[in-house]
Design a protein with these regions (language model features):
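Residue-level detector of alpha-helix initiation sites
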Residues: 32, 223-224
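Conserved active-site-proximal phosphate/metal-binding subdomains
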Residues: 24, 174-218, 224-360
Length: 360
């Protein structure tokens, strides 16, 4: 690879695909990780990930046809990310199981030749059904426990005679939607998540033997620097997924005010919220979240984003809240973040961040 910095980190192999650096940039929606960020990460030899959640929010006609605009934007941003990457790294997509048009997003990503589909916010039980085994696109579930990992691997093997190409193990320090109860998150310091990672690595070995292939494990949630990467690798992981740090980069697709809110954030500004998705999430405390705590914000328009959403009962419209934030209204929008956002102190470039992580 023609970058000027070297790294002792080994490459990440996902089947027949190889990322020179074992660093996946986590998918962030709405609109936070699209082609600009994902393409820049791939250009550095990592895995750039586009979030498909309401990805077409700024396409003409979105107010009337969210589904069509999102599919159009998936095509556009995968193509644009590849143009930026110039053949380096890998370009993947993150598709939430909770999305109303989950199947359509998966099929569009496959048709567009995404290198990998990473799927969470629910368990992607039918993902192998939607992704042909011999196409170029790899499939990766996000899990937060050995129980979830075993459930998916067992189900995929039994129902589809398939297994995961990659497993993302997301811990309790992650941002966005979390695969833990509020009680678990409140007592996360008592949790031995390192052991959970080891258990998942042990669990997947049965399926590696059964299918005659390696299933790399990538650790996510609270990964901030090279020390964290080395720790994950020492546990037996093959790579890491990092999201929040990539928000504070010039290439991130969010508004500059969104990025600056990350830089300005303190540890005490982070809170656990209840998302309309039905899962706990981690986000920045702001006037919007205080309004939500005092009572629901009536939903004036439905954007048809979630499979299970009762417009008359949800505490607020998650689509509107996320779009407001990514467009720069950081006081009145929802800003997901990881537990370590308070450690971010500047906006840098993807190149410099990847160099820092790679060189240590």
């Amino acid at each position: 690879m023609d970058r000027e910095y070297k790294s002792s980190l080994r490459c990440l192999k996902i089947g027949d695909k190889v990322a020179e650096l074992p660093i996946i940039q986590g998918g962030m929606g709405v609109g936070v990780s699209r082609s600009s960020l994902a393409g820049a990460v791939a250009a550095e030899g990592g895995v750039g990930v586009i979030s498909t959640a309401q990805i077409g929010y700024d396409e003409a006609g979105f107010e009337k046809d969210q589904a069509g605009c999102n599919l159009k934007a998936i095509r556009k941003h995968i193509w644009m990310a590849r143009e930026i990457a110039k053949g380096k790294g890998l370009v993947g997509v993150n598709i939430m199981v909770a999305l109303k048009h989950y199947k359509e997003h998966v099929k569009e990503a496959v048709e567009c030749g995404a290198d990998v589909i990473i799927s969470g916010a629910g368990l992607p039980m039918n993902l192998p059904e939607l992704v042909p085994e011999f196409c170029r696109t790899k499939i990766a579930p996000i899990v937060s426990s050995k129980r979830a990992a075993n459930l998916i691997l067992k189900m995929w093997a039994h129902r589809y005679n398939r297994t995961a190409d990659l497993i993302v193990v997301e811990g309790p320090e992650a941002g966005g939607h979390l695969g833990f109860s509020r009680d678990q998150l409140a007592h996360r310091d008592e949790m031995d998540f390192d052991q959970e990672i080891r258990d998942i690595i042990a669990c997947k070995k049965e399926y590696e033997e059964k299918f005659g292939r390696e299933i790399p494990v990538v650790v996510a949630g609270g990964i901030f620097d090279r020390k964290d990467i080395d720790h994950a690798m020492a546990l037996g992981a093959d790579g890491v997924q990092i999201a929040s740090r990539f928000v504070a980069t010039k290439e991130c697709d969010a508004d500059e005010r969104y990025k600056q809110a990350y830089v300005n954030a303190r540890k005490e500004d982070v809170q656990i919220i209840q998302s309309p998705v039905g899962m706990p999430g981690r986000a920045l405390c702001n006037p919007f979240m205080k309004l939500v705590e005092n009572g629901r914000i009536p939903v004036k328009k439905c954007y048809n984003c979630l499979e299970k959403c009762n417009q008359g009962q949800v505490p607020y419209c998650i689509t509107k809240a996320l779009i407001d934030a990514v467009e720069g209204d950081v006081e009145n929008g929802l800003m997901f973040c990881g537990a370590n956002v308070g450690r971010i102190d500047k906006i840098t470039s993807v190149h410099e961040l990847m160099r820092e992580l790679a060189e240590g």
